[in-house]
């Protein structure tokens, strides 16, 4: 009944930075050429949503509907869409996979150039957004906007998933869990029998721990200032736990002493340039690999050149190195086959109306993942 019509639905709108989100009725346009309109069933709340709201530089990125870790059902498709049918289960992707650009054609990267990100760093341009509220254009965040009952996404930024997948759980594969798991498996390429350190035990860090464990690491050192996170890290395979506040010497020295000179692989899952440096310097010279996973663009990152000259490698990872259309369905299948944990990340469930409570929980480190229901 909704096909071909503008849909009025509920969404959480961020009218300006540093203010609570407001539940509004918005209008969601029909999908244009090559676009898909998706009924969002559930969405996680990710730290990157908070980053845009509270810390990001992009003050012109408002009003906006945040959310980029969602799952839903195809409601309708625009002209030229052949890959998707109404009723199919999908996960919208904040990194597209057009399949045609030189990045998509290379196995080395997932950095597709066809997506929204070439217009601006974090929101769709006003001409691309399909949302309006109270007569104003409302921007779409990371090309997705899952804090809305309906959203419109280009078909190159949608992954089709197993019809048996529970949407209120696999939504986490739209960002956090895939990001951390893939950083270990795809980017760091953690080796069996290796020693790893993971800095920051939010959902991304815990997923990185799970990735290290899945890759066969024999020792996984979990590092966090909040010791409450250590029990959870154990569930995902961590073997050792370090709280930097318990030590007077730098954390890199603590880890170096624990591991006979340094770890083989480290993953920074915080988004703090000081921690990034510590993660690199915790690696063993000669072959240690450190991966930046946590997101920030507010400061420069630095280290002494000898750290790299001595054979360490510094890498970055976005969305776990997964090409979305290929990787997300595989991760969903891995979950259904019980090879990847998801339920253990979910500490809270609430309706969309409680989105500000979910944001507060994350801001104060009181949750791993909160899943919002949009039904």
UniProtKB/Swiss-Prot annotation:
- Membership in a protein family: Belongs to the zinc-containing alcohol dehydrogenase family.
Q: Subunit info?
A: Homodimer.
The alphabetized UniProt keywords are: Acetylation, Cytoplasm, Metal-binding, NAD, Oxidoreductase, Zinc
Q: Where in the cell is it found?
A: Cytoplasm
Question: Mostly located where?
Answer: cytoplasm
Q: What is the official name of this protein in its record?
A: Alcohol dehydrogenase 1
Where do the annotations place Zn(2+) 2 binding?
98, 101, 104, 112
Reactions mediated catalytically: a primary alcohol + NAD(+) = an aldehyde + NADH + H(+); a secondary alcohol + NAD(+) = a ketone + NADH + H(+)
Q: Does the keyword Transport apply?
A: no
Give the UniProt record's GO annotations in the biological process aspect: formaldehyde catabolic process
Positions of Zn(2+) 1 binding? 46, 68, 175
GO molecular-function term, one example from the UniProt record: alcohol dehydrogenase (NAD+) activity
The record's GO CC annotations read:
cytosol
InterPro entries (alphabetical): ADH-like_C, ADH-like_N, ADH_Zn_CS, GroES-like_sf, NAD(P)-bd_dom_sf, PKS_ER
**Residue list for modification N-acetylalanine:** 1
E.C. no:
1.1.1.1
Positions of NAD(+) binding: 200-205, 224, 229, 293-295, 369
């Amino acid at each position: 009944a909704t096909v071909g019509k503008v849909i009025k639905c509920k969404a959480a709108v961020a009218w300006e930075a540093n203010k609570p989100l407001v539940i509004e009725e918005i209008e969601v346009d029909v999908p244009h050429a090559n676009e898909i309109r998706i009924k969002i069933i559930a969405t996680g709340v990710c730290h990157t949503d908070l980053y845009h709201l509270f810390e990001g530089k992009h003050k012109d990125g408002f009003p906006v509907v945040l959310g980029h870790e969602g799952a839903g059902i195809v409601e309708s498709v625009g002209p030229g869409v052949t890959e998707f049918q109404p009723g199919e289960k999908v996960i919208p992707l904040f990194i597209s996979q057009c399949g045609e650009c030189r990045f998509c054609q290379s196995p080395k990267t997932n950095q597709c150039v066809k997506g929204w990100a070439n217009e601006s760093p974090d929101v769709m341009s006003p001409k691309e957004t399909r949302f309006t509220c109270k007569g104003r254009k409302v921007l779409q965040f990371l090309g997705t906007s899952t804090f809305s009952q309906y959203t419109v996404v280009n078909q190159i930024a949608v992954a089709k998933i197993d019809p048996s997948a529970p949407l209120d759980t696999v939504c986490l594969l739209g960002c956090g869990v895939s990001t951390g798991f893939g950083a270990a498996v795809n980017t760091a390429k953690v080796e069996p029998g290796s020693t790893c350190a993971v800095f920051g035990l939010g959902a991304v860090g815990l997923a990185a721990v799970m990735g290290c464990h899945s890759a066969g690491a024999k020792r996984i050192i979990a590092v966090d200032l909040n010791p409450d996170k250590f029990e959870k890290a154990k569930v995902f395979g961590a073997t050792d736990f370090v709280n930097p506040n318990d030590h007077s010497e730098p954390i890199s020295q603590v880890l170096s002493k624990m591991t006979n000179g340094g770890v083989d692989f480290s993953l920074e899952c915080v988004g703090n340039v000081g921690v990034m440096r510590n993660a690199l310097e915790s690696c063993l010279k000669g072959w240690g690999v450190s991966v930046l996973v946590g997101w920030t663009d507010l400061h420069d990152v630095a280290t002494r050149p000898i750290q790299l000259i001595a054979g360490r490698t510094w890498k970055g990872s976005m969305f776990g190195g997964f090409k979305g259309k290929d990787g997300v369905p595989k991760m969903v299948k891995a979950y259904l086959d019980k090879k990847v944990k998801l339920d253990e990340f979910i500490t809270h469930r609430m309706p969309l109306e409680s989105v500000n409570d979910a944001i507060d929980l994350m801001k104060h480190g009181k949750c791993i993942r909160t899943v919002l229901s949009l039904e």
